[in-house]
């Protein structure tokens, strides 16, 4: 029934964010026409939590958050402090358009 998922990042500077995803995070992409880049995402999982704020969140998962932060530092990109959460160790990257992107090393069981 469901064959995939399509996530959207809304940005004040979408062109800069697209280049960041492609060139800094090295996420493969295709040009679907007119310069509109669609990025390939790795296998994903979906959690549903209680709440009434109507917001959804997007996090990327990495194997080693310390190595991720070091790799971005080598590209002159600063990540937020690594914090412990019940479900993993998380950092945030501020995209060129100003949005924050969470990246975490999962400590929870994964499907």
Each language-model region and where it sits:
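N-terminal beta-strand motif that seeds the catalytic metal site of vicinal oxygen chelate
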Residues: 1-18, 45, 56-58, 107-111
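Core segments of cupin and vicinal oxygen chelate
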Residues: 8-46
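Helix N-cap motif at beta-to-alpha junctions
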Residues: 13-14, 63-65
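Short amphipathic alpha-helices within nucleic acid-binding modules
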Residues: 20, 66-71
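Short acidic/glycine-enriched loop/turn segments that link adjacent beta-strands
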Residues: 33-36, 54, 85-89
């Amino acid at each position: 029934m469901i064959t995939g998922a399509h996530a959207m990042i809304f940005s004040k500077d979408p062109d800069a964010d697209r280049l960041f995803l492609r060139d800094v995070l090295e996420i493969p992409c295709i040009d679907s026409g007119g310069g509109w880049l669609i990025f390939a995402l790795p296998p994903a999982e979906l959690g549903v939590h209680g709440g009434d704020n109507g917001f959804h969140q997007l996090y990327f998962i990495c194997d080693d958050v310390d190595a991720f932060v070091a790799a971005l530092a080598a590209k002159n990109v600063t990540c937020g402090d690594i914090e412990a959460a019940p479900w993993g160790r998380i950092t945030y990257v501020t995209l060129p358009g100003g949005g924050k992107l969470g990246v975490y090393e999962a400590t929870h069981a994964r499907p």
